[in-house]
Amino acid sequence: MAKISKRRQAFAAKVDRQKLYAIEDALSLVKECASAKFDESIDVAVQLGIDAKKSDQVVRGSVVLPAGTGKSVRVAVFAQGEKAEQARAAGAEIVGMEDLAEQIKAGQMDFDIVIASPDTMRIVGTLGQILGPRGLMPNPKVGTVTPDVATAVKNAKAGQVQFRVDKAGIIHATIGRASFEPTALRSNLSALIEALQKAKPATSKGVYLRKIALSSTMGVGVRVDHATLAAQ
């Protein structure tokens, strides 16, 4: 534990916590700090200019990251008939109806995301207390309740991430792994920021994107000058 602390302190000394770094410099620093023995995730925190206490200013959605997430995702789908076949063909590991619901109630949840066809919500709705706290409850706002289950499965497999503002008005998301090239991380971050811009509440006033900070799993936060992110 002491070694981790010393390593973190060494990297923290390299980062000016008050400085806004150009995106290329920020990514370079974050990747340098990601020196653990595993492939650390690269995470972003975005402070939004919204009042998270107001229901009309809750920012939520999803985006497919162009370079993927670097993570293998297991998908469960509630569907029947032709839609069930389409889900399987798209790569879903688990497809079912009442049988899948019973597995979930029994604690068998070997999946990372749940997708549901609208006609199955009578079944899925009974699982809210189980799936909700785990962040797995299907929701049309993030594209996991949809008649086009095949596309939803493909998106999940391709690197779709869901985002939702927390009580402090901050969005947290993973945009890749330390092993990713800087260009891949930048394209993923750009896609996320674009999705956040599109999700901006009409009632939000003033500066919307207030702060952007990058970090690795074991690293320190590096603030980003998002004007450099927009520059090509």
UniProtKB/Swiss-Prot annotation:
Keywords noted in UniProt: Repressor, Ribonucleoprotein, Ribosomal protein, RNA-binding, rRNA-binding, Translation regulation, tRNA-binding
GO molecular function terms attached to this record: rRNA binding; structural constituent of ribosome; tRNA binding
Keyword Lipoprotein: no
Superkingdom of origin organism: Bacteria
Signal peptide: none
Cellular component annotations (GO), alphabetically ordered: cytosolic large ribosomal subunit
Similarity comment: Belongs to the universal ribosomal protein uL1 family.
The name this protein goes by in its record: Large ribosomal subunit protein uL1
The encoding gene: rplA
